[in-house]
Amino acid sequence: MRPISVIVPTYREAGSLPGLLDGLASIRADGHDLDVIIVDDNSKDGTVELVADRGEPWVRLITRISERGLSSAVIRGLEESRHDVLVVMDADGSHPTSSIPDMEQALAAGADFTLGSRYITGGSTEDGWGVLRWINSKVATLMARPFTKVLDPMSGFIGIERATWQRAAELDPIGYKIGLELIVKCRCTNVVEVPIHFSTRRHGESKLSLKVQWQYLVHIVRLARFKYPRLSSFIPFACVGASGMIVYAGLLALLDVMAGTMVDTWIRILVAVLLTMTWNFLWDRRLAFWDAGSRSIARQYAGFVVVCSIPVLVTFFVTWYYSDKIVLPLAGVIGSAIGSTLGLFFNWVVNRLVVFKRD
């Protein structure tokens, strides 16, 4: 096995580090050349003292004072590494150190990227995963499908050759999914998944949060802009349109409760349509057409309203048609679905080329 540099990003993982370092020490005891770079975000939980007390010369600690974030910590570790084979793994004990030789063998056999996979044949997770965590993982994997066909693109246990990561386009990761960033930016085409058993952490707290999930969505948008520059605005545009359907139905329900028979149905529908268009405009401007030229927001809004008027009219009349046959919110769902589907590609093309055109 060739010499390996193992990068371990940490934040408040002092309780987990001894087990991880013991596992890595056992690999060295088998005669494999391996060093470890721990990149810690100034945890102040005893990490510095723990590494110093162990006194292992093959373990190097880098403490970052002002920087934060797992992905940037990994990049710092890659920059500080010494060997040509690079492995990144979590400190919490979820990744088995015993799989590192298998990952190195995959790279030696010609893979340009390898990762420890829970979902390939032979991989597994511990019992006790809740339904929400399972759904979260599957949805995140589905969202990564336009960028890679691997079964576990969310894995944080990855291996890469130094020459491969150094050819990367400008790395701009956010959140925790540095592996997906490297697969896309390094243009990795031969990705090999190594089956692993993913263990539940024994110490510390999980870093998964709503903020992390939001960062993942932003990351997906960034990667789409990189890999599919001509079509990258369509994905967030479609997502905003889908959210607009929910907003539209919710507004109709709210107006139905607040106004009832005091306000004509067509007025309630019109108010809901205009508010939904404003919602879509604000989010499209931020997510889909972020690179638009320097036209004023007022002119962009006016143009957006005009362009969207055709599918909006369809939405309006379909909702009105069904409003006396079924409850208004359900009529809004039907109208919004038909109008949004008909107008999706038309709105995207015209808004991209005219309203939000690049300078």
Predicted regions and their residues:
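Hydrophobic helical membrane-anchoring modules
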Residues: M1, L171-G250, D284-I310, W320, ...
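A conserved acidic beta->alpha catalytic loop
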Residues: D40-V48, G93
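Short aromatic/hydrophobic "clamp" motif used to bind/position activated sugar donors
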Residues: L86
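Short, well-formed alpha-helical segments that are part of the catalytic scaffolds
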Residues: E13-S26
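Short beta-strand/loop segment that forms part of the nucleotide-sugar
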Residues: A25, H32-S43, I62-R64
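Cell-envelope/extracellular polymer assembly enzymes that use nucleotide-activated donors
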Residues: P3-S5, D35, E181
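Conserved donor nucleotide-binding strand/loop of the catalytic core
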Residues: L34-D35, V48-E80
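Acceptor/aglycone-binding surface of glycosyltransferases and processive sugar-polymer synthases
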Residues: I65-E80, T97-Y176, R201-S206, K211, ...
